[in-house]
């Protein structure tokens, strides 16, 4: 059944790309939304099959081409819990992004091309995460790169747009080259392309050396290439400069790129090739350090930004660092929980920000916004809910996922430095979330008269604005409901099945960690309470600063410490 729904969806995407001029925008929208909706409904029916029963399915669609004498490469799928998780996340966001796109760009001249490219991007990600062999994996890896280029370059007549698209494409070519080298070396060592064989027998070849240089372990070189590709694709520290520029893409495309597709492809690469990566001695240490450093750098950069979309872009870099950090632990259940929480609520944040930007007449600078609450109350509540989940405040899904970060940071080498970086990164999430909410919805002193002159009653009551805004808000609301249900399902089966944090420590940490120092189980219980204190302190700080004579509106966004001290002491 999976092959049927995927084939129907893929053919719908190809048909809409080839004949978009004959289908019209409504035809392209209905065809793609129907096919992805059916695919999503089928995926939802298999929740228990993969998340509880851990089912593994291998599907051979057709024979592709002969690689050598007697060896045929098949177009095949390898579906396990990891592949199903990424597929479900991508399809869930993709369904509502389609609805949002049609409402948001209904009167744009190139709406058919945008919807077709978005669905081609989704189909490319599904091919990648469900690939059954190395050739199909590389095919999907290349597809998400080329489709992301066309999405970022959607308004190619603008010079900055093409530069940003070419920059992202160039960086991704480095990751493509590294993946290609790694796949060739894997085939040279294992003499097989199928994931079923590679992942099961790779440990038997752990002592393989390169033929020309026998002093080099081939698996160390393979791990280096795979990690390099993952770090570039997931915008880790040093390779992150392409991601903020990708904000030139339309808002629905940005929601997909930053939540479920392009940046999460590097995370999937680590999870898929984990049996190979763990053969390297330094894999866990390097991954943990790079992830923690990226999370801190991305969070601090987001605090000092004034462009609304770039704040979310650097926030994505920070959360990608958290995901890479979790991958170093080796327990995929924890990565999947954090991936779902971040992916869903980051997509919701982008869709809400899209409505904000349209309302402000395409201004993205927070310094030119303010007092939008009375005009956009629905977007405010949607954005508050998503940002509180991303920040990890108590009583929200992000609180459970970020507690895992503190638990894991105490079982690694350099745990003091890593714990401090993770803690500071989580705190920065609270500050840039407050910046977005306060400076766009409540800061009336900073708002420009040009904005209010443009926001007139005729515009608010126009057929264009009222209908598109209502439809987009419905899409955002349905995505929130679906996200909450799926996140609650995952947290219930993956996290709350363990009665206490001490049970979590005994079952997972002592089994999978490589630390040599014994830790106190009682100390583990303090992390969540410690984060509670930080969160409550920040809420008091915000409330205190709001009612003071010296409001935060008079404090520059660039003065992070002035903002903090001004709100606390004045």
Curated annotation (Swiss-Prot):
Main location: mitochondrion
Subcellular location: Mitochondrion inner membrane
This protein's UniProt keywords: Electron transport, Membrane, Mitochondrion, Mitochondrion inner membrane, NAD, Respiratory chain, Translocase, Transmembrane, Transmembrane helix, Transport, Ubiquinone
Membership in a protein family: Belongs to the complex I subunit 5 family.
Name the record gives this protein: NADH-ubiquinone oxidoreductase chain 5
Stretches that traverse the bilayer: 2-22, 27-47, 56-76, 77-97, 109-129, 134-154, 179-199, 221-241, 251-271, 285-305, 311-330, 335-357, 380-400, 417-437, 476-496, 524-544
Family annotation (InterPro entries): ND/Mrp_TM (IPR001750), NU5C-like (IPR003945), Proton_antipo_N (IPR001516)
EC number in record: 7.1.1.2
Catalysis performed (reactions): a ubiquinone + NADH + 5 H(+)(in) = a ubiquinol + NAD(+) + 4 H(+)(out)
Biological process according to GO: ATP synthesis coupled electron transport
Organism field: Paramecium tetraurelia
GO molecular-function term, one example from the UniProt record: NADH dehydrogenase (ubiquinone) activity
GO cellular component: mitochondrial inner membrane
Pfam families associated with the record: Proton_antipo_M, Proton_antipo_N
Domain of life assignment: Eukaryota
Membrane topology: Multi-pass membrane protein
Main function: Core subunit of the mitochondrial membrane respiratory chain NADH dehydrogenase (Complex I) that is believed to belong to the minimal assembly required for catalysis. Complex I functions in the transfer of electrons from NADH to the respiratory chain. The immediate electron acceptor for the enzyme is believed to be ubiquinone.
């Amino acid at each position: 059944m999976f092959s049927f729904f995927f084939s129907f969806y893929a053919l719908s995407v190809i048909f809409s790309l080839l004949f978009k001029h004959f289908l019209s925008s409504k035809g392209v929208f209905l065809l793609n939304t129907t096919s992805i909706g059916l695919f999503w409904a089928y995926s939802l029916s298999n929740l228990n099959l993969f998340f509880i029963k851990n089912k593994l399915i291998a599907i051979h669609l057709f024979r592709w081409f002969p690689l050598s004498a007697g060896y045929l490469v098949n177009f095949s799928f390898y579906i396990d819990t990891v592949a199903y998780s990424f597929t479900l996340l991508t399809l869930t966001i993709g369904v509502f992004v389609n609805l949002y796109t049609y409402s948001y760009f209904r009167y744009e001249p190139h709406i058919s091309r945008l919807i077709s490219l978005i669905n081609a991007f989704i189909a490319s990600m599904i091919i990648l995460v469900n690939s059954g062999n190395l050739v199909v994996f590389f095919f999907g890896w290349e597809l998400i790169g080329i489709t992301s280029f066309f999405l970022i370059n959607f308004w190619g007549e603008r010079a900055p747009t093409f530069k940003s698209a070419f920059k992202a494409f160039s960086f991704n070519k480095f990751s493509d080259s590294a993946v290609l080298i790694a796949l060739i070396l894997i085939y040279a060592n294992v003499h097989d392309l199928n994931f079923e064989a590679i992942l099961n027998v790779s440990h038997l070849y752990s002592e393989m050396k390169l033929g020309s240089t026998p002093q080099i372990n081939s698996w160390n070189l393979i791990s280096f290439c795979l990690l390099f590709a993952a770090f570039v694709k997931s915008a880790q520290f040093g390779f992150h400069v392409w991601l903020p520029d990708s904000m030139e893409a339309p808002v629905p495309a940005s929601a997909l790129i930053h939540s479920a597709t392009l940046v999460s492809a590097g995370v999937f690469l680590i999870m898929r090739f984990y049996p190979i990566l763990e053969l390297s001695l330094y894999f866990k240490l390097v991954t943990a350090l790079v992830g923690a450093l990226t999370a801190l750098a991305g969070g601090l950069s987001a605090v000092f930004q004034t462009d609304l979309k770039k704040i979310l872009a650097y926030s994505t870099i920070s959360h990608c660092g958290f995901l890479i950090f979790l991958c170093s632990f080796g327990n995929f259940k924890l990565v999947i929980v954090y991936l779902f929480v971040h992916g869903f609520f980051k997509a919701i944040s982008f869709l809400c920000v899209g409505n904000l930007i349209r309302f402000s007449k395409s201004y993205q600078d927070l310094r030119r916004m303010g007092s939008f609450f009375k005009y956009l109350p629905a977007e405010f509540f949607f954005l508050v809910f998503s940002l509180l989940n991303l920040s990890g405040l108590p009583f929200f899904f992000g609180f459970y996922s970020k507690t895992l970060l503190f638990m894991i940071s105490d079982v690694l080498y350099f745990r003091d430095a890593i714990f401090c970086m993770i803690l500071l990164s989580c705190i920065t999430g609270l500050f840039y979330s407050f910046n977005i909410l306060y400076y766009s919805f409540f800061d009336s002193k900073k708002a420009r008269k040009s904005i209010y002159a443009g926001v007139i009653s005729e515009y608010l009551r126009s057929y264009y604005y009222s209908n598109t805004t209502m439809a987009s808000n419905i899409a955002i609301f349905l995505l929130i409901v679906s996200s909450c249900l799926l996140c609650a399902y995952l947290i219930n089966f993956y996290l709350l099945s363990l009665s206490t944090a001490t049970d979590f420590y005994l079952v997972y940490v002592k089994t999978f960690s490589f630390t040599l120092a014994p830790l106190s189980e009682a100390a583990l219980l303090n992390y969540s309470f410690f984060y509670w204190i930080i969160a409550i302190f920040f809420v008091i700080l915000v409330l205190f600063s709001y009612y003071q004579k010296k409001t935060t509106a008079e404090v520059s966004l660039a003065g992070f410490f002035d903002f903090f001290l001004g709100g606390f002491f004045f």
